[in-house]
Each structure stands twice: as C-alpha cells, then as structure tokens.
Design a protein with these regions (language model features):
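Small-residue hinge/turn detector
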Residues: 1-4, 21
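Short, well-ordered beta-strand micro-motif
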Residues: 3, 125-127
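Cysteine-rich, disulfide-stabilized extracellular repeat modules
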Residues: 5, 16-17, 25, 30
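Exposed extracellular interaction/assembly regions and N-terminal maturation sites
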Residues: 30-101, 120, 127-144
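Extracellular interaction modules
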Residues: 7, 25, 118-120
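Terminal beta-strand-rich extracellular "head" domains
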Residues: 100-118
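Short loop/beta submotifs within extracellular cysteine-rich repeat domains
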Residues: 9-12
Length: 144
C-alpha cells in the first residue's frame, strides 16, 4: 500500500491479510478489538449532560459534588451499552438518576445507587431498550 504525505509518495506499507471489512455487509471479525470511548475526569460537573453518540463509558475518579445524571442527549441504538464508574474524593456524594422520560433510566432487577460509598468504586451498567425508549439499569456493584 502506497502512503502519501499529500504532496509526494513517501513510503509503502504492507497491507493486512484477509478480507477487507465492508461498511454494509455482515462479516465475522477475528482477533480485532474495539476500544471503548471513555470520558474520564476527576469530578463530573452536575448535571451530567451525556451523549451516547460520543462515549461508551463515563468515569469520575474523585467526585467532589452531588451529581445528577440526565437523560441521554444522543441517538442510541437498541441494545447499546453504557457504563458509569464513580469514585468519590473521600466524602460520600449523592447520585440522582433522571427517570420517566425519553432516554432516561429505568431500574430492571437492580436499584440505582443514590450515593457513593466513601473511597469505593461503584459501577452502573445500562442497556438501551428501544421499545421502551429507556436505558435499563441492569447491573450495579460497589467495591468491597
């Protein structure tokens, strides 16, 4: 494969082996990895106005204030997943989840956490349910 810098051919690279990946046909990929798109910050400003088009996970590594997690402003697809990870800064922080509206959260077999546990990481896993137009919270766990 020839490589150009925009004005001249500068080198060539060995093309990968195997079939090319198409954009519309169904293909099985082997030995490929899709890196999650993660938004990580020390403390998330409240409210969290998040967009499922941009990220697969949100992480707060030293949450310093109470946090409201708004409904998704993106255009999720059925069965899309999102993970939220919270660690406070040594003080328990209130968590409020938007419910009851389009692309908001719904508890399915779990209870959404309403506070962080001091110095412990909490994960919340959700799956988008297109029929219900909700992010179904299906997993919550806090570090022991």
């Amino acid at each position: 494969v020839a490589v150009s810098n925009g004005s001249a051919w500068i080198t060539s690279l060995t093309a990968p082996t195997g079939a090319l990946v198409g954009t519309t046909d169904t293909q099985t990929l082997t030995n490929k990895r899709i890196d999650p798109r993660v938004s990580s910050t020390a403390s998330i400003a409240s409210p969290l106005a998040w967009d499922s088009d941009d990220f697969d996970a949100y992480a707060a590594t030293a949450q310093a204030n109470a946090l409201t997690i708004n409904a998704d402003s993106g255009t999720p697809v059925n069965a899309q997943k999102i993970i939220f990870r919270f660690l406070d800064n040594g003080t328990a922080r209130a968590l409020t989840w938007t419910t009851g509206s389009s692309k908001s959260f719904r508890e399915v077999g779990v209870t959404l956490p309403t506070t962080t546990t001091v110095n412990k990481t909490t994960y919340v896993g959700c799956i988008y349910n297109a029929a219900a137009d909700r992010w179904d919270a299906v997993a919550t766990v806090t570090e022991a």
